[in-house]
Amino acid sequence: MIGRLRGILAYKQPPWLVIDVGGVGYELEAPMSTFYDLPDVGRDVILFTHYAQKEDSVALYGFLREGERRLFRDVQKVTGIGAKIALAVLSGVSVDEFARLITSGDITALTRIPGIGKKTAERMVVELRDRAADFSSGAPITGQLGPDAVSEATVALQQLGYKPAEAARMARDAGAEGDEVATVIRKALQAALR
């Protein structure tokens, strides 16, 4: 089991990143919440990981905060939810916001997260309500991202399941001159939840 990786960030392009640990490059899939706060390529990084092995595949997921990894694991315990939707949850809302939505039973807001319909949202509320208070996001880590924020945000939104035209519109509407990628993505996802 691989629980944590510490190394040099060698590559990042949502949803994938590569960490060089002693000359071995570990490829991980990560939610946008992690990408928001990653350091620049070539810098040291520590990620909490989740190792998943299925009959025909092996996957490694990375998170900057233990609370994100815990939420990722807990969301997958809900009937009918897998890693793809768990990543969409972490990409769409913060851990604290998700806990608030579950505690308050806000089905409408949950259905705005890509891949979550009304029945899935209802199941999530029922199955996670008792554990919602245990979700903790931890302290944020500051990160810097590239200059062409709208273009990079468009690609990231497509990776989250939005159609190319919709992703481009969302990024364009959310972006302002000089914005970082994380800011554009965050604004676009928040606008989609309204």
Curated annotation (Swiss-Prot):
GO CC annotation: cytoplasm; Holliday junction helicase complex; Holliday junction resolvase complex
Subcellular location: Cytoplasm
The keyword Nuclease belongs to this UniProt entry's keyword annotation: no
Domain-related comment: Has three domains with a flexible linker between the domains II and III and assumes an 'L' shape. Domain III is highly mobile and contacts RuvB.
Annotated stretches, region: Domain II: 65-140
Protein name, per record: Holliday junction branch migration complex subunit RuvA
UniProt keyword list: Cytoplasm, DNA damage, DNA recombination, DNA repair, DNA-binding
Region Flexible linker, residue ranges: 140-144
Region (Domain I): 1-64
Gene Ontology biological process: DNA recombination; DNA repair
Gene3D superfamilies: 5' to 3' exonuclease, C-terminal subdomain, DNA helicase RuvA subunit, C-terminal domain, Nucleic acid-binding proteins
Molecular function as annotated in GO: ATP binding; four-way junction DNA binding; four-way junction helicase activity
The protein's assembly and partners: Homotetramer. Forms an RuvA(8)-RuvB(12)-Holliday junction (HJ) complex. HJ DNA is sandwiched between 2 RuvA tetramers; dsDNA enters through RuvA and exits via RuvB. An RuvB hexamer assembles on each DNA strand where it exits the tetramer. Each RuvB hexamer is contacted by two RuvA subunits (via domain III) on 2 adjacent RuvB subunits; this complex drives branch migration. In the full resolvosome a probable DNA-RuvA(4)-RuvB(12)-RuvC(2) complex forms which resolves the HJ.
The keyword DNA-binding is annotated on this UniProt entry: yes
